[in-house]
Structures are given as C-alpha cells and as structure tokens.
C-alpha cells in the first residue's frame, strides 16, 4: 500500500479522522517551507498538501492567490517544490505529501519526467486542479506506475457521471469541495456534505476529505463528524501571511494542534 493508503487504514483502525492541512510552497519565505511542513506534521497533520505556486490559480480565493504571487516573486518553481519535499523526507519518512496545483508546470516539465522526479523526491500524491478525470487516464496511470496516488476533486455540482469518472482514475483519497466557488469561501453546510458523501462512496471506494469553508476548530470538528478527513488551507495561509516570520512555525503548529484536538473529538463514523 502507498503511504496515503497506510495512513487512512491506520486512522480507520483507530476510529479517527484525518487532518490534511495545506500551505503554499515558498510562502511566506522559500527558506522556511520545510520548517513549516515539519510544524504541520508535529501539530498532528496526517497528510500534508503542498501547493505548487502558479500564476493563474483559478480555483483559489484571494488568500491563496496572494500566496502564489509571493512565492512566484521569490523564484519558487516546481523543481524547487520537489527539492523541499526531498529535504522534508530527510527527517520525516512517514507523513504523506500531496502536491496540489495546476497542469502547466507539470506539462512544461513533461509528465514522465515529473512522475520520476516526484517519486524520487518522496511525493505521495498529486492533485491537478485543471485535469478533468475523464481526460486523465494516461496521467493517472503514469502517476500510479511511479507509486504516486492521483487525487481528484468532486463538488456539490458533480453529476453521477463525474463521480463515476473519478472512481475510474483516483486513488489515495478524494477531495470533496464542500462549497461552490473558490477556496476560502464561507457558509459551510455540514448537512449538505453529509448527504453527498454516500453518493460519492457508492461509486468511489476511497476515503473522502472535505475542504473549502473550514476556518477553525468548530468547523473542522463538524466536518469530521461526517467525512473521513478535514482539509484546511486558506485559514493556514492567512495565518502565515499575518505572522511574524520568526513565529510562523510555532503559530502554525499551535493552530494545527487545536484542529487535531477538535477532530479527535469527533466520534461519528463517516457515511
């Protein structure tokens, strides 16, 4: 099994839910990315989503857009992100790392070259926002051949056909976008999420992580009551945007530890 599959199997065996925090590689300072990744793991992250900066992040709200702009302005590239993962792996061989981003940087490197470089760096999963599952069979096969889980998005508007298409290509887990719109939006409706997850699981036999709209321990716990994992990004990126550089890792670890405690208080099994 992959590191991601092992992680979710262990969580299920313990009756626990996953915590998947997101930060943008290179923000606020490229020299601190690995330190921040360790802070996430030490705070209780089960999987780390590491954003690959891109100039046109269409699915992201203003907070993550700004973080991408800052990272790009400091020269962060896909190869630099892979190097960050490689350096993270020098100390942490257990926590899965998922790269989340857009197709252009991967296509510029070449899918085969990317698969090999990501494997060698210690990447466990890849979520390419603008790769529709119906057109991603070759890409997903290349990732799986390299031991990397291809991860896909589903949304409240996803049809049964789209869910089935994700089921054909995805592995690791599915990222369910709980809201229409972009990352960082508000008005989370947990009852709607709870109603959608059985439809997803009937066609996609994978854990479901839920993100978008999760801002604090209370919303994280509410989502953990109905999902297999909680994904949180914009709030963490905002924290890093506002923190003094010398305090960023400690503040991030403390915030994530609060989420971990709240999620561990969620006892209801996922649908």
Swiss-Prot record:
Catalytic activity, reaction form: (1S,2R)-1-C-(indol-3-yl)glycerol 3-phosphate + L-serine = D-glyceraldehyde 3-phosphate + L-tryptophan + H2O
Q: Which residues cross the membrane?
A: none
> Coiled coil located at which positions?
none
SUPFAM superfamilies reported for this sequence: Ribulose-phoshate binding barrel
User: Active-site positions, per UniProt?
Assistant: 49, 60
Mind listing the UniProt keywords for this protein, alphabetically?
Amino-acid biosynthesis, Aromatic amino acid biosynthesis, Lyase, Tryptophan biosynthesis
Q: Which Pfam families match?
A: Trp_syntA
Q: Top EC class per UniProt?
A: lyase
Named from the GO MF annotations, one term is:
tryptophan synthase activity
Which pathway does it take part in? Amino-acid biosynthesis; L-tryptophan biosynthesis; L-tryptophan from chorismate: step 5/5
- The catalytic activity of this protein is classed by the Enzyme Commission as 4.2.1.20
What Gene Ontology cellular component terms go with this record? cytosol
InterPro entries tied to this protein: Aldolase_TIM (IPR013785), RibuloseP-bd_barrel (IPR011060), Trp_synthase_alpha_AS (IPR018204), Trp_synthase_suA (IPR002028)
Q: How does it assemble?
A: Tetramer of two alpha and two beta chains.
**Family according to the record:** Belongs to the TrpA family.
| Described function | The alpha subunit is responsible for the aldol cleavage of indoleglycerol phosphate to indole and glyceraldehyde 3-phosphate.
Q: What is this protein called?
A: Tryptophan synthase alpha chain
Query: Which organism is this entry from?
Result: Burkholderia thailandensis (strain ATCC 700388 / DSM 13276 / CCUG 48851 / CIP 106301 / E264)
């Amino acid at each position: 099994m992959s590191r991601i599959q092992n992680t979710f199997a262990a969580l299920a065996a313990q009756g626990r839910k996953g915590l998947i925090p997101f930060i943008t590689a290179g923000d606020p300072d490229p020299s601190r990315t690995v330190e921040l990744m360790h802070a996430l793991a030490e705070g209780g992250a089960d999987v780390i989503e590491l954003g690959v900066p891109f100039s046109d992040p269409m699915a992201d709200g203003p907070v993550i857009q700004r973080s991408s702009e800052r990272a790009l302005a400091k020269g962060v590239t896909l190869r630099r992100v892979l190097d960050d993962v490689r350096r993270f792996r020098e100390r942490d061989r257990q926590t899965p790392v998922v790269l989340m981003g857009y197709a252009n940087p991967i296509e510029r490197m070449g899918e085969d070259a990317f698969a090999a470089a990501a494997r060698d760096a210690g990447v466990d999963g890849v979520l390419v926002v603008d790769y529709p599952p119906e057109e991603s069979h070759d890409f997903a096969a290349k990732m799986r051949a390299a031991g990397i889980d291809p991860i896909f998005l589903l949304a409240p508007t996803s049809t049964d056909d789209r869910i089935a298409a994700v089921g054909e290509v995805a592995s690791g887990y599915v990222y369910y976008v709980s809201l229409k719109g972009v990352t960082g939006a508000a008005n989370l409706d947990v009852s709607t999420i709870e109603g959608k997850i059985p439809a997803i699981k009937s066609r996609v036999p994978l854990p479901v992580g839920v993100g978008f709209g999760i801002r604090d321990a209370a919303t994280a716990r509410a989502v953990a009551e109905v999902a297999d994992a909680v994904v949180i990004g914009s709030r963490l990126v905002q924290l890093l945007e506002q923190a003094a550089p010398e305090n960023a890792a400690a503040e991030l670890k403390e915030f994530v530890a609060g989420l971990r405690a709240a999620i561990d208080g969620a006892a209801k099994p996922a649908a």
